[in-house]
Amino acid sequence: MSELLKLHHLRPAPGSNKAKIRKGRGEASKGKTAGRGTKGTKARSTVPAGFEGGQMPLIRRIPKLKGFSNAKFKTVYQVVNLDKLSKLYPEGGEVTIEDLVAKGAVRKNQPVKVLGTGEISVPVRVSANAFSSSAKEKILAAGGSVTEI
């Protein structure tokens, strides 16, 4: 029977462990210039971040922006026009955001604003987050009602 497999007999497979190359340690392989060539910026340290070869860097070409903007606090509404409502509800009735989501007119979890483009002839009871003044006038003129949530 051959020698039993023992922990102290285990050796790595040939060629699996390569010796680490120690650059810049003596005149032998990768010594002196350590594979960087001679002189110049790249031979010394790294090229500075943002350096563009002498042309004016992007960070200095663009003006400094000052001040404060309320843009990130702006409410962005999903828009539904009256002509869309008249197509979705030809017989009139109750119009809620949940109904509009179910019919695929709007997405859920975003506020809805009804705008006055188009005409509506049947009375509808619309509840939404916001209405334009023309949409309110046209819905009320058709005999419907408007509820802001």
UniProtKB/Swiss-Prot annotation:
Cell inner membrane listed as a keyword: no
InterPro entries, sorted: Ribosomal_uL15, Ribosomal_uL15/eL18, Ribosomal_uL15/eL18_sf, Ribosomal_uL15_bac-type, Ribosomal_uL15_CS
GO molecular function annotation: rRNA binding; structural constituent of ribosome
Residue segments, region Disordered: 1-52
Gene Ontology terms: biological process: translation
Keywords, alphabetical: Ribonucleoprotein, Ribosomal protein, RNA-binding, rRNA-binding
GO CC, alphabetical: cytosolic large ribosomal subunit
The organism's place on the tree of life at top rank: Bacteria
Quaternary structure note: Part of the 50S ribosomal subunit.
Family per similarity comment: Belongs to the universal ribosomal protein uL15 family.
Function as written in the Swiss-Prot or TrEMBL entry: Binds to the 23S rRNA.
Protein name: Large ribosomal subunit protein uL15
Organism (species): Thermobifida fusca (strain YX)
